[in-house]
Amino acid sequence: AAGSDIVIVTSGVARRPGQTRIELAKTNVAIMKSIAPQVAKHAPNALCIIVANPVDVLTYAFLKYSGMKENQVIGSGTLLDTVRLTYKLSQELGIAQRSIKGYVFGEHGDTSFIPWSMVTVEGIKLDEYTKGARRLGIDANDFDPDEVITYVRKSGGEIIKRKGATFYGVANSVVDVCEALMGAQDLVTVVSSMMHGEYGVDDV
């Protein structure tokens, strides 16, 4: 609607079973090219959250085609991947998901990666936690990091295969972002945004 404070962009062709996010890019970039100028025209001061896939590509496309400021446009990025990471680890370790802090970086989907050195359990490095738990006789299952990253990367495809779409997980994640943007929730998380030299990356 005209004058909106937040615009959530979900427009795009749905991902088919077996289809990669990159295969969606050509069609969905064209859709973004058509709607981005209209959003800029009717809600020029809005904060825009891009959810459509491939989200990182489309966030960049929306920013370029809309002409809006970089601090007005973000994508859902690896937010959902991060939730899947903490969920999987909670199952492997037998502890509450809220006790685990960690992030998934990179592109949303099959090329994402986990910086394991940043994963903690109540502030304790993950490897230190598992070693300490075993010393104390606490059940801390050994887990295969490769299995965890496979779960994180492939969960979306499995959900699409079984249910046809991934509505609820991403919707819940975007609600958290909206609440943070409106000041209703203090949240530190991962999103897609324009880079200018951070981590040695520029104009991405």
Residue ranges and their predicted role:
Residues 66-72, 82-204:
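C-terminal substrate-binding/catalytic lobe of Rossmann-fold NAD(P)-dependent dehydrogenases
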Residues 16-17:
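Helix N-cap/beta-alpha junction loops of NAD(P)-dependent oxidoreductase domains
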Residues 20-87:
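Rossmann-like NAD(P)(H) cofactor-binding subdomain of soluble oxidoreductases
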Residues 11-13:
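Conserved NAD(P)H cofactor-binding loop of Rossmann-fold oxidoreductase domains
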